[in-house]
Amino acid sequence: METYQNTQGSYGQRAMGGRSMDYTVDMVFCIDATGSMEDTTGSRMKVINMVKQNALNFYSDFDRIMTGKNKKVRQLRVRIVAFRDYLADGADAMMVTDFFMLPQQEREFEACINSIHADGGGDIPEDGLEALAYAIKSKWTTEGAKKRQVIVVWTDAGTHDLGFGASSEHYPKGMPTSHSELNDWWDTMDRNAKRLVLFAPDEMGWSYISQNWDNTVHIPSVAGGGLAEKGYGEILNAIANSV
């Protein structure tokens, strides 16, 4: 496991002699869409509100940070997986989109983000591992010499065991049935390209992944706090540092 503190060194391969490197970047944002993740009244902005507010500027903000690192983003695609709880939320438990090409489709991306309303969730653990499974099985680009396949998870809750919600008629077929099998899925991804950035509490599911998966950065969040303690700049920098 690579830690946040040594992320830049661990991921390495920085530009030499001031010459920028071109990157083809795919990102999947796995967003906990349960009730605690959004707040329209509190003084501290929670993560869904933050993502909504900055969706239209995400490409330009990300590109600016990458340019400062002598890294040129030749292509950026972003996919959304918004997750809740299959037993509690049924058909609304998972929203999975195709990739949005940015900045060309930034208006569609913004509309998608704005359609997410934090609601439901039932008990405190959520079906975040199923969301991660969807992300791993994305149709990643095969173009470009310098590819990055980045999964970012935002949640303030632990996870159910895989298959916890399998009795729901809406539970997807073909999901892994154990941590070991999900780990095998992760191992099939290109090790040079894959990155996992977890904004998640040090609780069920996530702690196992952060301790056992390669190319993983875990920035602990406060359980039940909606990631209100994380600023947009911190989140953006953590994502950029993983590329």
Can you say where each PLM-predicted feature lies in the sequence?
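Acidic, low-complexity intrinsically disordered regions
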Residues: 1-243
